[in-house]
């Protein structure tokens, strides 16, 4: 499907996902994807970038990547142009330009705390803390995991489905990963998340849209109790 033209009557959201190397205390982004969407999940623009400074220049770090077995995928995507290779500052500039063009200050992610941390950590690591923040000042961070907990997690059908399939955490809570939520909302019970930036964005925007369609009260902001 071709990206939609900008409709100035709509409010836009940047749905974003990162894949990282290094440890969870200092995650460094090598893959970042985002899509400009509305709350119904319509896609207006898609972006996929490989961070040159981490992926190609930090080869030892890349061997620590959680999904290191997927690295050949990125070489193929960089070769065929499916993902653009760029320096971090260029990626940041393009994101800021997209946010300005679509007049949005909202960035949403699934488990947004991690993506906010990974982009901030990468920004500080590459600039030696000269520049500390990746997103424009005043950006509002949304978390589809919070939305899903408030909407999908309260549905008796979801609880029954999780119990039937064994999607229960050790503490008894229902699992809320993007992969499992997408299996539920799509009916594709064999679905496996790709764990690459843009591909994951395109299922996470469906989670956002599903939550909106239920017309239930839900928290959206990352730092909202």
What are these regions (language model features)?
Residues 2-122:
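Conserved non-catalytic scaffold segment of RNase H-like nuclease domains
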Residues 15-17, 141, 204:
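Generic enzyme active-site microenvironment
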Residues 48-53, 134-152:
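A short, structured active-site edge motif that brings together acidic residues
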Residues 106-113, 117-118, 163-225:
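Acidic, Mg2+-coordinating catalytic module of metal-dependent nucleases/exonucleases
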Residues 114-142:
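Substrate-recognition/cap helix-loop segment adjacent to the acidic, metal-dependent catalytic center
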Residues 123-127, 152-156, 186, 209-216:
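Hydrophobic/aromatic-lined pockets within catalytic cores
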Residues 142-169:
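Short alpha-helix plus adjacent loop in nuclease-associated cores
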């Amino acid at each position: 499907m071709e990206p939609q033209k900008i409709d100035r009557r709509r409010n836009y959201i940047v749905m974003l996902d990162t894949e990282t190397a290094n440890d969870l205390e200092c995650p460094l982004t090598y893959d970042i994807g985002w899509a400009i969407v509305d709350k119904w999940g319509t896609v207006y623009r898609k972006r996929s970038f490989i961070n040159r400074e981490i992926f190609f220049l930090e080869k030892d770090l890349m061997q620590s990547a959680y999904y290191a077995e997927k690295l050949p995928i990125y070489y193929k995507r960089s070769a065929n142009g499916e993902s653009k290779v760029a320096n971090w500052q260029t990626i940041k500039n393009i994101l800021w330009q997209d946010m300005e063009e679509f007049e949005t200050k909202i960035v949403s992610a699934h488990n947004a705390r991690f993506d906010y941390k990974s982009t901030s950590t990468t920004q500080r690591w590459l600039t030696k803390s000269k520049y500390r923040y990746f997103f424009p000042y005043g950006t509002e961070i949304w978390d589809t995991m919070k939305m899903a907990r408030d909407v999908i997690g309260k549905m008796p059908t979801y609880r029954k489905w999780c119990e039937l399939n064994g999607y229960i955490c050790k503490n008894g809570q229902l699992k809320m990963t993007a992969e499992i939520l997408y299996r539920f909302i799509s009916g594709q019970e064999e679905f496996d998340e790709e764990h690459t930036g843009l591909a994951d964005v395109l299922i996470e925007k469906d989670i956002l849209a599903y939550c909106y369609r239920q017309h239930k009260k839900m928290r959206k902001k990352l730092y909202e109790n």
